[in-house]
Design a protein with these regions (language model features):
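Activation segment signature within eukaryotic-like protein kinase domains
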Residues: 67-68
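Conserved short submotifs of the Hanks-type protein kinase catalytic core
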Residues: 34-48, 52
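Terminal C-lobe "cap" of eukaryotic-type protein kinase domains
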Residues: 212-237
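A short, aromatic-enriched beta-strand patch in the conserved N-lobe beta-sheet
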Residues: 29-30
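Protein kinase catalytic-loop region centered on the HRD/HxD motif
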Residues: 73-83
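Conserved N-lobe beta3->alphaC-helix segment of eukaryotic protein kinase catalytic domains
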Residues: 1-19
């Protein structure tokens, strides 16, 4: 407790507890003791997606699609609930520990609700996943956090396949300007796949439509849900899953929980 309890912690509590979904880590309760504010969440036994991908040196296209299908369903639900996550990444995506793992999104500390919180206008998130409009935002300007979430999903898909970030380069490691170089590549959407990987034309088409600098021209989630690559081997009922999700009866409560 104290100065570390910021507006981000409050947003995390208010937004996360509304998101009850199979692909989102369940928010169970929050309580305060003498020195700490404690958030109790569902346990995900399989660790996070970053470690999972790194251990395998990247995933086969079919396995990456399995995870990406779940990611998009989770993100679509979050957006339906009026929330932009603003920090979607492998490190914030947990696994349930089953033989064919299911993903669980977590960490809503940078999230914003479109009705109850101001429009996104700050450069928050993890640099490697930032959308161009987030990088370019200036004081007094805003951007659509839901649209920038889609960019982050595209970066996640690339990392799942390759095992490294799309806008980083091996030669940057010893360069003191490596962060700035990466940011410039993001703004130019300058990425490619290693020659060792054989990426299907459908996958390349989808990524080319997600990783678009102009947010107005970026593919939408409904369009992703209809894309041929996304729909391949899609389990029955997945597209309709979010129609059956029940919104918590408590609604969005903004009482002082800190």
């Amino acid at each position: 407790r104290g100065e570390k309890i910021t507006k981000y912690v409050e947003r995390e509590i208010l937004n996360h507890r509304q998101l009850v979904h199979p692909h989102i880590v369940r928010f169970k309760e929050v309580f305060v003791c003498q020195n700490f504010l404690c958030i109790v969440m569902e346990y995900a036994a399989g660790g996070d997606m970053f470690d999972y991908v790194v251990r395998r040196g990247g995933l086969r296209e079919s396995e990456a699609r399995w995870f990406f299908q779940q990611l998009i369903i989770a993100t679509e639900f979050i957006h339906r609930m009026g929330v932009a996550n603003r920090d979607i990444k492998l490190e914030n995506t947990l696994l349930d520990g089953s033989p064919k793992p299911l993903i669980k999104l977590c960490d809503f500390g940078y999230s914003k609700h479109e009705k109850f919180q101001s429009a996104p206008g700050s450069r928050v998130g993890t640099p490697a996943y930032l959308a161009p409009e987030v990088i370019l935002t200036t004081t007094g300007n805003t951007y659509n956090g839901k649209v920038s979430d889609i960019w982050s999903c595209g970066v996640m898909l690339y990392v799942m396949l390759v095992g490294s970030y799309p806008f980083e380069r091996a030669e940057d490691k010893k360069d003191p300007q490596r962060l700035q170089r990466m940011i410039q590549r993001i703004l130019r959407v300058e990425y490619s796949f290693p020659e060792r990987l054989h990426i299907s034309a459908e996958l390349q088409d989808l990524l080319d439509k997600i990783l678009v600098a102009d947010p107005e021209k970026r593919i939408t989630i409904p369009e992703i849900l209809e894309h041929p690559w996304y729909n391949k081997d899609l389990p029955p009922g997945v597209k309709e899953m979010n129609d059956t999700m029940v919104i918590p009866s408590s609604g969005y409560q903004t009482e002082d929980c800190l």
